[in-house]
Swiss-Prot record:
This is Prostaglandin G/H synthase 2. The active site is at H193, Y371. It comes from Rattus norvegicus (Rat). Binds 1 heme b (iron(II)-protoporphyrin IX) group per subunit. The lineage of its organism: Eukaryota, Metazoa, Chordata, Craniata, Vertebrata. The keyword Signal applies.
Length: 604
């Protein structure tokens, strides 16, 4: 009888044994498949490795590994030797060859077609075809794994509030040594909200941004109904209003477009744009206004060039031109600034025409998560000689009208943003958003930091001190997580030691760049079928794209052509400004900004 009981217990134990793939035994992007309840097999197909766990390199792979420099070495070369890079930048053949390598080496790290999502940790038609899911770079940790990170770490992750308070929250503002400014910060927020549109009703693994890329739905609206409400249906233009001799977005009343505004916001300040959340802060409405003006400006140019075209063709072609302008500005101004490279990046779709490249994209939830750059935000916003708190800034379009776009551009170009990596720089005002980012990552069962580093060809960290580059935060993290292999992705990105004089650490760049460049160059307008003058109304439209920059965008649409850049030209200690005691029309004294932002989206 006792023997039977022992056998029964053993059988029950085996039936509840952990999934053998929980330990992530397959290396170098090999795929683990369970066989029975306690065996697994690694599929090493086309990885360049073989063996039980895909750890033995093939001959050509071994040579590539010997010759390939580390990401930090590449970064060092690209951010030093300025004289050499000045020569390279002026030799088209060399510049094109290097840019082609940058694009292909980065974008080939992204699976296309997509593979996994929050509910499918294996290949399935649902994971491929259902656009309402974010895709995944790594499958979720299986439900039957013994710990949240597979087999490493404790059975429970540390309290997210404790993680936030000990290593993420700001003690004092840490400016970005790379000189990133608020013009950049609000561009990032405005630009990414066309594809980071989490469906909060369905959960963090789902998106409402079904275009999965740069389609400018934040300008034109996600649905055809919203687009039609925003359109003038005359000369291809969008609706607008004129205030003080300048063009601004129309109101909610005039368009009947749904926007998110608290009840106290006056009717005349409820501007209506493509993204319903852009009334949150005037910095977002600034860019919404600039792109509205740009669309209507391009329509005027096309109308003059093609008087025979109807409203629909003028609208659709102008949209394609603005998509092209956006991609060019993002690569040549935005990514250029973030990289810190002396090599001059170039937007030229023809560089990929003879390469293996798929013109499609699917936004990954990890890309959404890593883009939560809340440390960029300052403690206050300086416009002209006035200083606004978070409370005064929220849902207060009156500030935009009071100061005007020119002063906004000038002020945000001068105001330095915060450093993202290095820890302890998340503003208290958005702590609820940062906490939600941790909680939602857990809900989506992200794998550990080191698993993501391996996925993107980086060496895993061996200690918390190696991660942070110092001892004090490393000790806090060790007490919280115990094992470096159990370190969560999102907090790790914010506490990772920054590269020298840089805004980010290694992991943020090496994970983010492939997602970014694949999404940009995978746009249909970059394909051989689209990338030709006739797509954009002829040479005139093509020239608008090929000469676009953040400075030209501002000059063409803001009075006085104020200087615009994504970095502070001469970083100075922040001067004391006059605190603006008035919230103007906003009446926000009784509003908690962290609650408001959390209710809207963790992406804001």
């Amino acid at each position: 009888m006792l023997f039977r009981a022992v056998l029964l217990c053993a059988a029950l134990a085996l039936s509840h044994a952990a999934n053998p793939c929980c330990s992530n035994p397959c290396q170098n992007r090999g795929e683990c498949m369970s066989i029975g309840f306690d065996q697994y097999k690694c599929d090493c197909t086309r990885t360049g490795f073989y063996g039980e766990n895909c750890t033995t390199p093939e001959f050509l792979t071994r040579i590539k590994l010997l010759l390939k420099p580390t990401p930090n070495t590449v970064h060092y070369i690209l951010t030093h030797f300025k004289g050499v890079w000045n020569i390279v930048n002026n030799i088209p053949f060399l510049r094109n060859s290097i840019m082609r390598y940058v694009l292909t080496s980065r974008s080939h790290l992204i699976d296309s077609p997509p593979t996994y999502n929050v509910h499918y940790g294996y290949k399935s038609w649902e994971a491929f075809s259902n656009l309402s899911y974010y895709t995944r770079a790594l499958p979720p940790v299986a439900d039957d794994c013994p710990t949240p990170m597979g087999v490493k770490g404790n059975k429970e992750l540390p309290d997210s509030k404790e993680v936030l308070e000990k290593v993420l929250l700001r003690r004092e503002f840490i400016p970005d040594p790379q000189g990133t400014n608020m013009m950049f910060a609000f561009f990032a927020q405005h630009f990414t909200h066309q594809f980071f549109k989490t469906d909060q009703k369905r959960g963090p693994g789902f998106t409402r941004g079904l275009g999965h890329g740069v389609d400018l739905n934040h300008v034109y609206g996600e649905t055809l109904d919203r687009q039609h409400k925003l359109r003038l249906f005359q000369d291809g233009k969008l609706k607008y209003q004129v205030i003080g001799g300048e063009v601004y977005p129309p109101t909610v009343k005039d368009t009947q477009v749904d926007m998110i505004y608290p009840p106290h916001v006056p009717e005349h300040l409820r501007f209506a744009v493509g993204q319903e959340v852009f009334g949150l802060v005037p910095g977002l409405m600034m860019y919404a206004t600039i792109w509205l003006r740009e669309h209507n400006r391009v329509c005027d140019i096309l109308k003059q060039e093609h008087p025979e075209w109807d409203d629909e063709r003028l609208f659709q072609t102008s949209r394609l031109i603005l998509i092209g302008e956006t991609i060019k500005i993002v690569i040549e101004d935005y990514v250029q600034h973030l990289s810190g490279y002396h090599f001059k990046l170039k937007f030229d779709p023809e560089l990929l025409f003879n390469q293996q490249f798929q013109y499609q994209n699917r936004i990954a939830s990890e890309f959404n998560t890593l883009y939560h750059w809340h440390p960029l935000l300052p403690d206050t916003f300086n416009i002209e000689d006035q200083e606004y708190t978070f409370k005064q800034f929220l849902y207060n379009n009156s500030i935009l009208l009071e100061h005007g776009l020119a002063h906004f551009v000038e002020s945000f170009t001068r105001q330095i943003a915060g450093r993202v990596a290095g820890g302890r720089n998340v503003p208290i005002a958005v702590q609820a958003v940062a906490k939600a980012s941790i909680d939602q990552s857990r809900e989506m069962k992200y794998q550990s930091l080191n698993e993501y580093r391996k996925r993107f060809s980086l060496k895993p960290y061996t200690s918390f001190e190696e991660l942070t580059g110092e001892k004090e935060m490393a000790a806090e993290l060790k007490a919280l997580y115990h094992d470096i292999d159990a370190m969560e992705l999102y907090p790790a990105l914010l506490v990772e030691k920054p590269r020298p004089d840089a805004i980010f650490g290694e992991t943020m760049v090496e994970l983010g760049a492939p997602f970014s460049l694949k999404g940009l160059m995978g746009n249909p307008i970059c394909s051989p079928q689209y990338w030709k003058p006739s797509t954009f109304g002829g040479e005139v439209g093509f020239r608008i794209i090929n000469t676009a920059s953040i400075q030209s965008l501002i000059c063409n649409n803001v009075k006085g052509c104020p200087f615009a850049s994504f970095n502070v030209q001469d970083p100075q200690p922040t001067k004391t400004a006059t605190i603006n005691a008035s919230a103007s029309h906003s009446r926000l004294d009784d509003i908690n900004p962290t609650v408001l932002i959390k209710r809207r989206s963790t992406e804001l």
